[in-house]
Amino acid sequence: MDGEGHDINIWGARMSPSPAAAPVSATRGAPWSGCEGCPSRAADRRCVCH
């Protein structure tokens, strides 16, 4: 599943253009706040840390 890595990059760039805003939004008391690798909700589904 090499496409998985590409999917995360595409989602991260589409949802959060700024890498700094990504972690901040995820830490806003969200269900995926424990996942620092997931910049957006869409990426959370592909992220291993649910």
From Swiss-Prot:
Protein name: Mating-type pheromone BAP1(1)
Lipid attachment points (S-farnesyl cysteine): C47
Principal location class: membrane
GO MF terms held by the record: pheromone activity
Superkingdom of the organism of origin: Eukaryota
Higher taxonomy: Eukaryota, Fungi, Dikarya, Basidiomycota, Agaricomycotina
Keyword flag Cell membrane: yes
Example of a GO cellular component annotation carried by this entry: plasma membrane
Sequence intervals crossing the membrane: none
Organism name: Schizophyllum commune (Split gill fungus)
Biological role: Activates B-regulated development.
